[in-house]
Amino acid sequence: MTYRELGQTGVKVSALGLGGSHIGTPKLSSAEAVRIIRAALDAGLNFMDNSWDYHKGESEKRLGRALKNGYRSKAFVMTKVDGRNKKEAARQLDESLKRLGLDEIDLLQHHEVIRFDDVDRVFAAGGAMEAFLAARKAGKIRFIGFTGHKDPEVHLHMLRTAQAHGFRFDTVQMPLNLLDTHYRSFEKKVLPELTAAGIGVLGMKSMGAGVILNSKALTPTECLTYALSLPTSVVITGIDSMKILKQAFQIGGSFKPLTTREMASLRAKSAAIAANGEYELFKTTSAFDSTASHPEWLGEESSRTQRLTAE
């Protein structure tokens, strides 16, 4: 397994990460999920992705079971919370810690930052960032990041707002795939900002939860190899069987960065199906937006939004 620096944290992580949503899926038994996680850790894949809201907590519970009996020392554990105010974010974090059976998480991220208003809520007085900083001070978390999948401009707003508050994120998670380069591109707009700042880049949705593969235009190997060839710290991929785990290791184990010409060729190959975001449903629909169904996680709208919408 190839290992890469996680930004400026001083930590090295596996170039491939195990996606947390897939290990909590009902089609997979808890015992099989634990077997997959431990097989990945035994083979050197140490980056474990998760989130408070994945499958109503089942993903975190399964990861927690897998980390027992000495496996915690092999893992870099990341999870995410959706709360936008201090109280809700702190509540979700404590629940995640309990499910995982841990006193400390390596990386906690603001999940699903997909609206400009999300940024305002996170950094407002009494916002989620206060809970994150308090958790870090208390030794509950080591590093802080954020994720989002809708619009690169929201990511840029989050980065600039953090800078205005004198804060620097350790990591940023975003879609990086062969279609992204053509439509609302995180690769073009956000990736250069992160690499210049030395922030750890967490790539996700290299196959768009399988939707990109439904186009029949690209293969899993092309999708994953392209994402790995970008300046990422880790590419998180969904694995819900030992067969898929083996395939991921075959790609990762034999990985050699694509040449500039090879990457350009793949971009050209994907252009025809990428123009309108049809196969990047996470950008163009609410199908992947858990917070859209749970406004109570977000709390009140930001003061700016309230002011702008006031009659």
Question: Where are each of the predicted segments found?
Answer:
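N-terminal binding-site loop/beta-alpha segment at the start of enzyme catalytic domains
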Residues: 1-75, 131, 137, 310-311
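A general structural detector for well-ordered alpha-helical segments in enzyme core domains, enriched
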Residues: 2, 32-36, 59-66, 92-96, ...
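Conserved, mostly hydrophobic/aromatic
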Residues: 6, 18, 40, 48, ...
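Active-site mouth loops of central-metabolism enzymes
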Residues: 19-31, 78-88, 116-121, 212-218
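Short histidine/acidic/glycine/proline-rich micro-motifs that form metal-
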Residues: 22-24, 52-54, 81-84, 177-181, ...
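Glycine/proline-rich, positively charged
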Residues: 27, 84-189, 195-202
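Structured C-terminal cap/extension of enzyme domains
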Residues: 41, 46, 165-166, 189-311
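Short catalytic-loop micro-motif centered on adjacent basic/acidic residues
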Residues: 47-53, 78-80, 142-147, 173-174, ...
